[in-house]
């Protein structure tokens, strides 16, 4: 099996606080994992490091055999998607649902989606249909229920057809 994500002696500190301490872990294509722990145990920090969203204080992170820091952010975002429920709070509230999903196509930030009209709208519609929320595509994101927002964020996470999907 091919190793997709590999962490070697990864640590993360914030000031004097050690968040993660010498984590070594890897995952291979086709595997499914669950990271369990108490609130504040570092689960979100771990998946954010594994997805390249946060840089470890020490240790190394590799994606598909390459140091994660050597990959362009856009390439990494298209190959490894991190879906976080906290995303629902960071998205621009007035955006239409279809634009929330489309904005993930190239790892662009949601407020600038208007300048990317060539993004694959049909793929976004297909993904909304997959999660049975296609009827909401023109609605402003902030008008949705929390459950609807979560399904929209899942569709958004699949927009780039990532090799790896990390759910937080």
Regions found by a protein language model. Give the residues of each.
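Conserved ABC ATPase signature
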Residues: 115, 140-144, 148
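Conserved structural motif at the start of ABC-family nucleotide-binding domains
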Residues: 5, 19-22, 137
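Conserved ABC transporter NBD signature motif
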Residues: 59-69
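Helix-to-loop junction immediately C-terminal to a conserved catalytic motif
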Residues: 51
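Conserved ABC ATPase "signature" region
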Residues: 117-136, 161
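The feature captures the beta-strand-to-loop junction immediately N-terminal to the Walker
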Residues: 36-38
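Catalytic Walker B motif of ABC-type/P-loop ATPase nucleotide-binding domains
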Residues: 165-168
């Amino acid at each position: 099996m091919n190793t997709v994500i590999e962490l070697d002696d990864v640590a993360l500190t914030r000031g004097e606080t050690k968040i993660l301490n010498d984590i070594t872990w890897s995952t291979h294509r086709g595997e499914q994992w669950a990271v369990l722990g108490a609130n504040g145990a570092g689960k979100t920090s771990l998946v954010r490091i594994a997805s390249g969203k946060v840089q470890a204080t020490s240790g190394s992170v590799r994606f598909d055999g390459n140091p994660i820091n050597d990959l362009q952010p856009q390439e990494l975002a298209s190959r490894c998607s991190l879906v976080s429920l906290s995303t629902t709070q960071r998205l621009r509230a007035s955006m239409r649902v279809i634009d929330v999903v489309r904005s993930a196509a190239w790892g662009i930030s949601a407020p600038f989606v208007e300048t990317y009209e060539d993004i694959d709208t049909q793929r976004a519609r297909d993904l909304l249909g997959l999660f049975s929320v296609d009827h909401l595509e023109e609605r402003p994101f902030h008008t949705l229920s929390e459950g609807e927002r979560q399904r929209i964020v899942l569709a958004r996470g699949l927009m780039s057809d990532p090799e790896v999907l990390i759910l937080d």
